[in-house]
Amino acid sequence: MIYAGILAGGIGSRMGNVPLPKQFLDIDNKPILIHTIEKFILVSEFNEIIIATPAQWISHTQDILKKYNITDQRVKVVAGGTDRNETIMNIIDHIRNTQGINDDDVIVTHDAVRPFLTQRIIKENIEVAAKYGAVDTVIEAIDTIVMSKDKQNIHSIPVRNEMYQGQTPQSFNIKLLQDSYRALSSAQKEILSDACKIIVESGHAVKLVRGELYNIKVTTPYDLKVANAIIQGDIADD
């Protein structure tokens, strides 16, 4: 089976003084989360589309699903965890408890605040994850990346044409992801920045799918302005 895991667990601290977590803020008069969910509903391959949100926001999430006529029976809402990877594991726990997990099950995980992903990106994630077990969505780095260990001095400058910027979706064979996560030490889990690092640490290959420049993550007030401009300018592909 194929599952979508929409990660809506953040509280949006970088968005500044706003009344709601960033995933519930509007772009073009509709919550960011709803824009994102609508992209996944269009993909018939998904057996379930699972939204993980902070426990205290589950009721609000269910309310906006009703308000915007999200009636697809595949859409479920569960409580997220304390961090990104714990949230993904909560989604997997839901799958295990309700459906069981088969050897070939795939999960497509995606940031709720990336509303401009395309059908191509989603479908390529499904295909590559089913074939190879793990895939990340990336774009080539445009700017030179510098590394600083002390935030004051440059310690290295990687070769730019070997650098990519990670986006989402990040998609996995569920058993591979679960087993790899369980094998990590507590110290390793504390420094994880995304789910693909779980697979990299296990020694398993992670394939790449081409993202899009406009597949932005809406995390700051500036991003919110850019997101509205993308919609109003009809820049993103469907």
From Swiss-Prot:
Principal EC category: transferase
Name of this chain's protein: Ribitol-5-phosphate cytidylyltransferase 2
Q: Which HAMAP family match?
A: TarI (MF_02068)
Site positions (Transition state stabilizer) are R14, K22
- UniProt similarity note: Belongs to the IspD/TarI cytidylyltransferase family. TarI subfamily.
The source organism is Staphylococcus aureus (strain MRSA252)
Q: Which InterPro entries match?
A: IspD/TarI (IPR034683), IspD/TarI_cytidylyltransf_bact (IPR050088), ISPD_synthase_CS (IPR018294), Nucleotide-diphossugar_trans (IPR029044), TarI (IPR034709)
Q: What is the lineage of its organism?
A: Bacteria, Bacillati, Bacillota, Bacilli, Bacillales
Q: Where is this site: Positions ribitol 5-phosphate for the nucleophilic attack?
A: R160, K217
Q: Where is the signal peptide?
A: none
Q: Which residues bind CTP?
A: L7, A8, G9, G10, G81, T82, D83, R84, N85, E86, T87
One Pfam family recorded for the sequence: IspD
The alphabetical list of record keywords is: Cell wall biogenesis/degradation, Nucleotidyltransferase, Teichoic acid biosynthesis, Transferase
Supply the EC number(s): 2.7.7.40
